[in-house]
Amino acid sequence: MSPFSKRRSSQRGPSQGDGRNQLRIIGGKWRGRKLDFPKIEGLRPTGDRIRETLFNWLAAEIPGANCLDLFSGSGALGFEALSRGASKAVMIEHSAKAYQLLCAHRERLNAENAEIIHTTAEQWLLQANHEFQNGQDYFDLVFIDPPFQLNWLERNSALLADSKLFHPGSLIYLEQGSDQGLKLPPKWRPIKQKQAGQVAYGLYQQA
């Protein structure tokens, strides 16, 4: 089945209530809505302050944007983008538990423009690039925020940079541990870079 046609099925950190992990959407039409996420090793939602900084950077770019969230996890970035007016968000998640909650959030928020796909980022990128067709919508904005300890960022960044999935000028958000080195694809130029505690994050543009 095509990755483009699959069924859509603090630094202030996430709060905990009733034994569940929670975060909140901080801007847009769903501002204040809370999202549960499972306790899974490596699942670390982008905190409120970093998200606020990121979406301030993107204020002029989000409305109408076609977004890709490669390591969706809690859905913090994908649903935040939709809340603020993005046209669509394709959200990739490998964990079955996280995927099920993302689907539940989509239904609860009535987020019909969220496409949630249960696979790995690498598998999706390889298949999507192979099946990409001219005239298909490009991605304007890509979020890449994998589990820090698994060293997935560099491999998936290289796959994405060599893909057909976005256009010159597309923006890429990267998040990683501040102690991690990263060899960026030569096609990406830095726009904004910042650090908050043990998290380094930045916005890059496809040349």
Regions found by a protein language model. Name each.
Residues 1-207:
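Class I S-adenosyl-L-methionine-dependent methyltransferase catalytic core
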